[in-house]
Swiss-Prot record:
This is Cytochrome b6-f complex subunit 4. One of its GO terms (cellular component) is plasma membrane-derived thylakoid membrane. Belongs to the cytochrome b family. PetD subfamily. SUPFAM superfamilies: a domain/subunit of cytochrome bc1 complex (Ubiquinol-cytochrome c reductase). The gene is petD.
Length: 160
């Protein structure tokens, strides 16, 4: 038994539509050659030309010029590495910090096994997964903001 519904080719209305050319490509213009030969190259070359033109006409300086003789007090990583940097900074043992970072994807792999709910359901009907996601988001934002503070107030964000 198949789960796909097959068309009834004995239906005269359907046969009339198929005779006129109705099929999988009935609506709109065909992708070949209209889109692939004419529209796509215009968009691709237009985007490349726009980016090149902006880079030539308005080159922006990113930050201050490098000074090899002046080192900042604390060198921070890129913004997307702030939570990981904060974990390594606040934990006393570096091996423990690496284990905590490895525990994040391992913990996320356990979420489907904790809940015995259909994974295709509405996410708001999966309370454990939703709670873990929200808790992880809050902790990640908290660690990311804390990485920008000095080490002595980084855990409390200077609030306490």
């Amino acid at each position: 038994m198949s789960t796909l519904k097959k068309p009834d080719l004995s239906d005269p209305a359907l046969r009339a539509k198929l005779a006129k050319g109705m099929g999988h490509n009935y609506y709109g213009e065909p992708a070949w050659p209209n889109d692939l030969l004419y529209v796509f190259p215009v968009v691709i070359f237009g985007t490349i030309g726009l980016c090149t033109g902006l880079a030539i006409m308005d080159p922006t300086m990113i930050g201050e010029p490098a000074d090899p003789f002046a080192t900042p007090l604390e060198i921070l990583p890129e913004w997307y590495l702030y939570p990981v940097f904060q974990i390594l900074r606040i934990l006393p043992n570096k091996l423990l910090g690496i284990a905590c970072m490895a525990g994040v994807p391992l913990g996320l792999m356990l979420v489907p096994f904790i809940e015995s709910v259909n994974k295709f359901q509405n996410p708001f009907r999966r309370p454990v997964a939703t709670a873990i996601f929200l808790f992880g988001t809050v902790v990640t934002i908290w660690l990311g903001i804390g990485a920008t503070f000095p080490i002595d107030i980084s855990l409390t964000l200077g609030l306490f």
